[in-house]
Amino acid sequence: MKPELKTNDFIRVKGARENNLKNVNIDIPKNQFVVITGLSGSGKSSLAFNTIYAEGRRRYLESLSSYARQFLGNSDKPDVDSIEGLSPAISIDQKTTSHNPRSTVGTVTEIYDYLRLLWARIGIPFCPNGHGAIQTQTVNQIANQIFNLPVKSRIQILAPTIKNQRGTFANEFAKYQQLGFLRVWVDGQVYTLDEEIKLDKNTKHNLSVVVDRIVINQDKQTLGRIVDAIEGVIKLTEGRIEVLLEDGKILSFNKNHGCDQCGFSISELEPRLFSFNSPLGSCEYCKGLGFSYEPDVEKIIPNPLLSINEGGIDIFKNIVHGTSLDWQRFLSLINHYQIPLDQPLGQMDTDLVRMILEGSDEPIEIKTVSNSGAKNVRFEHYEGVAHLIKRRHLETSSQASREWYSAYMSEITCKKCQGKKLTTNSLSVKLGGLDIISFTELSIDKAIEFLLQIELNQEQKKIGELALKEIINRLSFLKNVGLEYLNLARRASTLSGGEAQRIRLATQIGSQLTGVLYVLDEPSIGLHQKDNDRLINTMMVMRDLGNTLLVVEHDSETMLAADYLIDIGPKAGNQGGEVVAAGTPLEVMENPDSLTGQYLSGKKQIEVPKTRHAGNGRTLTLKGAKGNNLKNINVTIPLNKLVLVTGVSGSGKSTLINQTLVPILERLVNYKNVKPAPYKEIIGVNHIDKVVVVSQDPIGRTPRSNPATYVSVFDDIRELFANTKEAKARGYTNSRFSFNVAGGRCDKCFGDGVIRIEMHFLPDVYVTCEMCDGKKYNPQTLEVKYLGKSIFDVLQMSCQEAYDFFKAIPNIARKLKLLCDVGLEYLQLGLNVTFLSGGEAQRIKLAKFLQKKATGKTLYVLDEPSTGLHIEDINKLLTVIQRIIKNGDSVIIIEHNLDIIKMADYIIDLGPEGGEKGGQIIAQGTPEQLLNQVDKSYTAQYLAKILK
């Protein structure tokens, strides 16, 4: 039910001028579902995020103390006259949640915290040796196990009172002394209580009281002392007992949980026991990661058909027979064992290959000569290429070096915990037959089903009722935003931007806040049309709680479902920044000035091609693909066609293309050292001579990187400036106009235009350079003009302005035209690329690749290119893609957008659902052929609605 709008219940924005906004005045209704749309670069994000959200955050920060503000960073006032009626604002964007390998869907949503509580309170410990559920142990049972240790063993019976806690514990030491104890065991060392024990209060410590020291003898007196000691321990620890053996090992017992057959015991169940971030619960070997980075033989020797001389050992391929010390040491191994340098490594004796990788079994003579000519001879074990890589990866302090060695390593599942991250004790606790990690490996759908059907006794129900309810609610929120195919163990760093955003959205629903302004950035990204209705309903629920939703979106269904629609335009960049239309979706559709309205009403649309591309008759066939959830599938991809890979979220599209097909081709065609997901074979690689992956990854990391430098048009522009009369008279070359080398650039900021101020524990702050006023060049360089414009003036131009300016210079105009063709005419040539969205970065890459001559054997791969694109922009992008096909090359696109899908020459639809229920090809063919498969394919069902 849409809430009734009250009088004056608006967010009133007056005079917004942030970025390209042109003094925008607008009243946005509060407690409504409001969508802001418009062409890419028209100013949507400038209004929603850079103005409204930024001001909301700034006001919140100003309400905090100066002490608190220093940890949250500064927030400048946006360029706006006033904003009235602003609520507390929360931004939910598309940034990946976390790059920390410990961060999972479960930890991000805090569901794992509730699970730890549930397993600790109502979980049942089981003996890992198959002796069934563990019952409480009596004092006599524990005493008998200790009594049966080898005769003459010297043991100390300890009462573990402090575990992983910070402090000096002076009061505790005094208390133990008063109770008559003589010794304590602290962090592996025994102290007497009459000496001064100094501990660092900021370090975590383990502390146990030495209750008795006993020599094991098979007599009643010894057994009696053990019983007395155990009873003394229990008074201090509520059941936890430790026995320190002579070799330093510790045996743990618990009066509450212990196996009466084999003596296995587990400490008191507490939430920390199930945390892979706590020393108490994490696997000792992998420290709770579930994996370790180890050298990968397939990456070290990517092509076993090559010999060592031919570069078969990838890390040595550029230093074969050189003077590098690494090669000289390796050559000592070669000479000692007479390893053939010209024999393919795949045909070499396995023992020799093992020694190359793992090192020599014996000390050998290793000869080296330094650059200065100094000779060195040593007898030692050769460490092996694999060990060399691992050691250097651990020892280096250089990020570049670490990335270099990482290229030869892979994540290997931990052998101790088998990837489960926790200790044996933690994993022995079951609920409904599952340990906590096995539960997190269930899909969201199955997890909900499991909890609804779990059988608990009355006591368990009473204790776990609230935690169970909270877990089921939060899992349901994730399901309602279309993420039922995910599992709680999924690493946050592997989530797409859309998935991460919807997880944050689900978390906010769980918080049940009211009176909040939520600002969202394209939440429909990565979502199949089938799941879109659920997402819209979820946002409606948030609105009905009494919140305002301000959503930047291009999806037609979302726009039509909005209470209020704002169209920013009329075009992009300097030609945008105005409110073209605002009102209900119907009112916007009736507004002749609104391009969005024309598309929504059907007056304007992307026309379905009358004929599909015939292709060149060649195909690429992948057999036996079974990575992640793929069900050993075979797929044939026709070449010289536009091929769309579709399917519901989590159906296996990215696994099939990005993790299997692309790495195979990059390895075989581009000769990259990458490892594909499991597959059987690939046929037709000879039809491909180049693979171009147009991803949404950032294209640069420094303020000097910009669109002009990335597409290489800046080289031509610098050459043009260097050929002006003024430049020649001064003796300037094209390097004078570069901000990457000294000479023409500003000497203070080194061509960045900004000065970076390191804030140590806070994010770095960038301030405009005072010397050049952000212009990057020194005054002398800026005096050189071409048609009245300096090099800085050119960098300030949009791509369209620059194209018009340089129209008479073919090599410059051609590159700028490509940027305009992919819908980036609004983009400033000198814009810092770190400010680009993923969609913009992807289109800049496409413009760069399109400069190269078509080979007829190039395969382009794009992943959701519609991200951030208005329907008009999609039309432009499709024109460029059609040009690629006409030039004889091939294009594969992973996409949910129906306007792109309907233009396909061939569709491969995966499903039928996401996660374990996906991974199969359920429909394939032309869009028209898919209409005959609507009973199997969700994509076909939605395609049928727009093709009729």
Swiss-Prot record:
Belongs to the ABC transporter superfamily. UvrA family. It comes from the Bacteria. It comes from Mycoplasma pneumoniae (strain ATCC 29342 / M129 / Subtype 1). One of its GO terms (biological process) is SOS response. HAMAP family: UvrA. This is UvrABC system protein A. The UvrABC repair system catalyzes the recognition and processing of DNA lesions. UvrA is an ATPase and a DNA-binding protein. A damage recognition complex composed of 2 UvrA and 2 UvrB subunits scans DNA for abnormalities. When the presence of a lesion has been verified by UvrB, the UvrA molecules dissociate. The keyword ATP-binding applies. Forms a heterotetramer with UvrB during the search for lesions. ATP 1 binds at G38, L39, S40, G41, S42, G43, K44, S45.
